[in-house]
Regions:
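An N-terminally biased module of ancient metal coordination in phosphate/nucleic-acid-related enzymes
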Residues: 1-88, 98, 165-179, 238-245, ...
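Structural preference for beta-strand elements that scaffold enzyme active sites
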Residues: 5-9, 37-39, 79-81, 98-101, ...
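Conserved, mostly hydrophobic/aromatic
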Residues: 11, 30, 100, 160, ...
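Extended substrate/RNA-proximal surfaces in nucleic-acid metabolism proteins
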Residues: 58-194
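Glycoside hydrolase catalytic-domain groove-lining segments
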Residues: 167-169, 175, 179, 186-202, ...
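Short Gly/Pro-enriched loop/turn and capping motifs at secondary-structure junctions
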Residues: 204-208, 238-240
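Long, positively charged, glycine-interspersed low-complexity recognition regions
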Residues: 213, 217-277
Length: 277
């Protein structure tokens, strides 16, 4: 069988963090959907109070045990990789996992308060006003500086690198076509090493009705391609129905940026995959 992006889903969440379905049900749904390379990537623990119950505990033993049991159960039928979506403010290590996704979900102000950039518009307003004195571009700059810091750690996958646009429908907070914004985003992208990190084309916000196109924006994908970077199609699935949600749209979007190939993550590393069969 020829490789296809639909055979791989490596950005997924379960009830062990903020997902809606159990690890068992997510794995079963992936197998039923024809996925051959499935990655479990729950959110890493953070010290943020409002995160508790939505991220893994600091002791990830139970998480690993469930995954290992499922790996044995599906041996010979589907590869299951145990990974971690590691946040910039995590207080645990990503060492020991088959792979990890580097992400930024929070900005921290001088008072020590954390603001989620992807929760809702109200939180983003509070972040802008309280942490950045109303300066939206100072907030954006701080976000992309954190993206660059995560990129410097050489994650196998860089997650939804322009997540700060999630609540920006209709350019509510800033104009995504404006030069000042795009220069900040492109500067962060320059920190990503295309020889060591794969950029995900992530449909998660599409599944939840926040966006009509995947992360990241087309101008970022075009620049990434110009630098010789590779992409992986992901669903950022939080439900068993979302394992490969929006993949056809993500493929078409990547093709607009000039890509003809993505990669698939396997137990033996990355393998190339044509976007079209």
């Amino acid at each position: 069988m020829r490789n296809s992006p639909f055979l791989c889903s490596v950005h997924t969440h379960t009830t062990l963090c903020d997902g809606k379905d159990s690890m068992e049900d997510m794995v079963s749904a992936a197998y039923t959907a024809g996925v051959q390379y499935y990655g479990i990537s729950s959110h890493s623990h953070t010290p943020i109070a409002q995160d508790q119950g939505l991220v893994l505990p600091q002791d990830m033993t139970a998480y690993c045990r469930v995954a290992e049991r499922l790996q044995k159960q599906y041996e010979g039928k589907m590869e299951i990789l145990l990974g971690l979506e590691w946040d910039s403010c995590a207080d645990v290590s990503f060492d020991g996992f088959a792979y990890w996704i580097g992400s930024v979900h929070y900005l921290k102000c001088q008072s020590g308060a954390y603001y989620a950039v992807d929760l809702d518009a109200e939180t983003l307003i509070s972040c802008q006003q309280e942490a950045f004195h109303g300066d939206v571009y100072a907030m954006i700059q701080a976000y992309f500086e954190q993206i660059a810091q995560v990129a410097a750690l050489r994650p196998p996958i860089l997650g939804h690198m322009d997540l700060i646009t999630k609540c920006n429908a209709g350019n509510r907070f800033f104009d995504e076509e404006e030069k000042i914004y795009q220069e900040m985003a492109l500067q962060a992208l320059q920190a990503v090493n295309p020889l060591q990190t794969v950029l995900e084309v992530n449909t998660g916000a599409m599944a939840r009705g926040y966006r009509k196109t995947p992360y990241p924006a087309l101008f970022l994908l075009k620049e990434w391609r110009a630098r010789g970077g590779q992409i992986v199609i992901t669903a950022d699935a939080h439900t068993k129905e979302g394992i490969v949600y929006g993949y056809a749209d993500a493929i078409a979007f990547a093709e607009q940026a000039g890509f003809r190939e993505s990669v698939i993550l396997t137990a033996n590393g990355w393998i190339p995959c044509p976007l079209q069969e």
